[in-house]
Amino acid sequence: MTDKVQTTLLFLAVGEFSVGILGNAFIGLVNCMDWIKKRKIASIDLILTSLAISRICLLCVILLDCFILVLYPDVYATGKEMRIIDFFWILTNHLSIWFATCLSIYYFFKIANFFHPLFLWMKWRIDRVISWILLGCMVLSVFISLPATENLNADFRFCVKAKRKTNLTWSCRVNKTQHASIKLLLNLATLLPFCVCLMSFFLLILSLRRHIRRMQLSATGCRDPSTEAHVRALKAVISFLLLFIAYYLSFLIATSSYFMPETELAVIFGESIALIYPSSHSFILILGNNKLRHASLKVIWKVMSILKGRKFQQHKQI
């Protein structure tokens, strides 16, 4: 029964992976083609492309971990291979979260309407420094990933199922509590960008409230371009917050799996939930971006035209 559930969850993970790769690759491809065409890239496109690339890598690492856990559990007993996987998981995990936070910050500075001198100064400079902010996020993620990977592998990453002729069911090299504590600290490290994103969300709400009040006083209505921009930004930010909470809880499940009898099943279940975040959020970003939305509609229209043309040819041959 356990093997059937694991296989089902693995197929689910493959489906989520395919959807996520499709959405994120589309974002990266459209922005890169536009970059080549115009020979320059807008700040928002740079953030979205960086976010898409980091999520493609994150999806690959999570799916690879699922396959190893189900098909080759003994690989967890080797330090070198798992050290590489651990490093790239921590790196891509932090990169994707920090890049999404950068997107929320960018929306806040470009759309919100405040008149504080510090806000106006940062609003004016955000396009100039966004590339440096993204580079700083990369350096910070590497700085976190290297020592964290060493600590995880020094204590051994996981309690692996020992497939031996002895009566041993589980072979563990580390104290489970100590290892779970390290994993928990890694998860807590992602709360900082989450709090920054949450702050941007509330400030955007405050800015929208003030803007609507000004529109009502001037009797110009509430559905102007600035209001629409606020609403689109809020949708993107709140979707990230909700999906991140589910993503965070999924890794809490994976961490607590060290104390469960069916450790492998709990980890795969947690990782199948974790795949929802990088997979589905890309489509929310596509719908919220005019260029990406129009490009996706063109692709859908072309695909439908090709399918209709094939059906017409088949009907004509009959």
From Swiss-Prot:
GO terms for cellular component: plasma membrane. One of its GO terms (molecular function) is bitter taste receptor activity. Gustducin-coupled receptor implicated in the perception of bitter compounds in the oral cavity and the gastrointestinal tract. Signals through PLCB2 and the calcium-regulated cation channel TRPM5. It is a multi-pass membrane protein. Residues 31-55, 116-128, 209-235, 288-318 are cytoplasmic. PANTHER family: TASTE RECEPTOR TYPE 2 (PTHR11394), TASTE RECEPTOR TYPE 2 MEMBER 7 (PTHR11394:SF58). The gene is TAS2R7. InterPro entries: GPCR_Rhodpsn_7TM, TAS2R. This is Taste receptor type 2 member 7. It holds the Pfam family TAS2R. It is found in: Membrane. The lineage of its organism: Eukaryota, Metazoa, Chordata, Craniata, Vertebrata. Belongs to the G-protein coupled receptor T2R family. The keyword Glycoprotein applies. The keyword Ligase does not apply. Several bitter taste receptors are expressed in a single taste receptor cell. It comes from the Eukaryota. Gene3D superfamilies: Rhodopsin 7-helix transmembrane proteins (1.20.1070.10).
